[in-house]
Amino acid sequence: MDARSLQVREVAATPAQLRALVARHPGLFPALFDSTAVGPLGRYSILVAAPGASLLLRGDGKLEARGVATRNKDFLGALDEWWSSARTEPADTDATGELPFRGGWLVYLGYELADHIETGLHLPALRADAVCALAQRVTAALVHDHLVGRTRLVAAGTAAETIAAIEAALAALGPAGAAAAPAAPPMSPIDATLRVAEQPPASFRDAVLRAQQYIAAGDVYQANLSRGWQLELASPADAGALFESLRRANPAPFAAHASLPGMRLLSSSPERLVRVCGRCVETRPIAGTRARHGTPGSDAT
């Protein structure tokens, strides 16, 4: 990114309006990184916009490159090659202040991508057309600073017509002080669910026992077990309404609403996995890292 092409200006937009934009215009706004925090840890909500070239790995292992010149058939290898070729000097910090976005990539890595890194894991198979991983270039974003209560439009080499489309979508919501309700009322998960499928309890217990054996043998110091649920709904779900319900039930500093090919991704987490700023790498794990009581015996009860 050329620092001279960077545009930053303040706009009138509330967090509720950012949530409405990602729900109503997924083609222009592919993902919202949402925060309910009031402190510095989850200071920003970032609505990325203007999606461009992409790498898409399907469940059948096929890599789709759109606007990316690569002969690499491996997703991570192709992404590393692309990132290295597109990397430039950072923009002048005076232009962005403390803004966390200056143009970049929207990246989704599914659990199943682990099977491409470490073979022999025997993970559940994805549908052939499902998204396993995605990397997409994004050049613009609406960034809301919760500490000072203002929103800025950041555009790094974004076409003028795309910036105009962003501003038009925001203006169509009405004044910043107006309520930006989701497209449908909040859903009751109990009333809306037709069928629930989950991993058999015995299978999960076996995984716990294996993890304990690995820890005792010194192979690992921690094992994170994931358990999936599949819900079949009685009627089509409105992603914006579901995200509003999730946000009320589990407010978090690190939440997301993303639109991927053929799917919507909603998440809510209290934990930031990793932050990289220059030569500084920061991780803040919060699960399974502290004893509950003073002795191992007390912890076991």
Regions found by a protein language model. Name each.
Residues 1-301:
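Extended alpha-helical targeting/anchoring segments
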